[in-house]
Regions:
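Outer-membrane beta-barrel transmembrane domain signature
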Residues: 24-35, 40, 146, 154-276, ...
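Solvent-exposed loop/turn segments connecting transmembrane beta-strands
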Residues: 50-61, 82-93, 230-236, 266-284
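Short glycine/proline- and aromatic-enriched beta-strand/turn motifs that initiate or cap beta-hairpins
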Residues: 21-79, 83-88, 156-162, 286-293
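Sec-dependent N-terminal signal peptides
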Residues: 5-17
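Sec-dependent signal peptide cleavage junction
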Residues: 18-43, 109-137, 292-293
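Membrane-embedded beta-strands of outer-membrane beta-barrel proteins
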Residues: 62-64, 98-100, 179-183, 238-242, ...
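Gram-negative (and chloroplast) outer-membrane scaffold detector with strong preference
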Residues: 74, 79-213
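Outer-membrane beta-barrel "beta-signal"
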Residues: 96-111, 277-293
């Protein structure tokens, strides 16, 4: 009796493993033109810090991040951030970048696209450990590639604590105001897929890497113990970055299913160099609450 029961249990386990192993996914439709290239995101957490001027670092900034298509080739974009928590303040700390990008060329290719099926995050406060688990597959899809030229305005205000040898000048305001110009490469995908159990779902993403030259003529009048000391000047900088837009489609293109908060995320990462800030990192997350075509 016990032997038969054990054999039945083993059989059920093997059957469940076999069923799970046989679960497959297939692409039923793919068209990157269905994806929404434009977005308006509420930026709820961004860090913006220059490593040569940590006094001017923003530990927590909020704002908006947007891209709006004027036509098939021309798009305008803007990033506006206000610092809620800075290491030092000398006036309001903010970053504002606004410009446009123009499509130079585009092509569509068949690619294997990674699709995230599930993600889970757990924190064990007792043992102070974190566990992340996810499941993903690669599915065939059409990917649109677009080369763009870009340019615009770049303005940032923060604090500056300038040091020279063993001389530490008074904390003052540092304002970057100038322009950027560069190139970008937009990759867009949208697909519909079906699992072997019949479940249907949509997936897609927009990835926007770019590289810019920053022309920021910056002049700072330094003071030492409240008295005028010297004037310093720098002009050139650069940045390279990427914006990743998850789920660039609406409920209508998602089998009439609501898209969750984190699935509607916009991730941004910039690295580069700014006058007197040196090497800098700007990175954060936004909630994509409006999508545009």
């Amino acid at each position: 009796m016990m032997k038969n029961l054990l054999l039945v249990c083993i059989g059920l386990v093997l059957l469940s493993v076999s069923v799970h192993a046989q679960e497959t996914y297939r692409t039923t439709m793919s068209d990157p033109e269905i994806a929404y290239p434009g977005y308006l995101g509420l930026n709820y957490f961004t860090v913006d810090a220059g490593f040569s001027n940590t006094s001017g670092a923003s530990i927590w900034s909020v704002g908006v991040d947007g891209l709006y298509p004027i036509n098939e080739k021309l798009r305008v974009e803007a990033l506006a951030l206000y610092s809620l928590l800075s290491l030092q303040k000398d006036g309001p700390a903010f970053l504002f970048s606004a410009g446009a990008e123009y499509g130079i060329s585009s092509k569509t290719k068949d690619k294997e696209v990674p699709v995230l099926l599930s993600f889970a995050w757990e924190k064990d406060y007792f043992n102070n450990t974190e566990t992340q688990t996810w499941e993903a597959v690669k599915l065939p899809a059409k990917m649109k590639y677009e080369l763009v030229a870009r340019g615009g305005l770049y303005v940032r205000n923060s604090a500056l604590e300038y040091e020279e040898g063993f001389t530490y000048y008074d904390v003052t305001s540092l304002t970057h105001a100038g322009v950027y110009a560069g190139v970008g490469y937009t990759m867009t995908s949208y697909l519909q897929a079906q699992a072997s159990d019949g479940y249907e779902f949509a997936a897609g993403r927009v990835i926007r890497p770019y590289a810019d030259v920053l022309i920021l003529p910056t002049t700072v009048d330094l003071e030492l113990n409240g008295a005028a000391a010297k004037t310093i000047e720098e002009t050139l900088g650069w940045r390279a970055g990427v914006v990743v837009v998850g789920k660039p489609f609406t409920k209508a293109e998602n089998y009439d299913r609501k898209i969750g908060f984190f699935a509607n995320s916009i991730f941004r990462l910039d690295i580069g160099s700014r006058p007197f800030d040196g090497f800098f990192v700007t990175t954060g997350m936004a909630w994509n609450f409006k999508k545009f075509k």
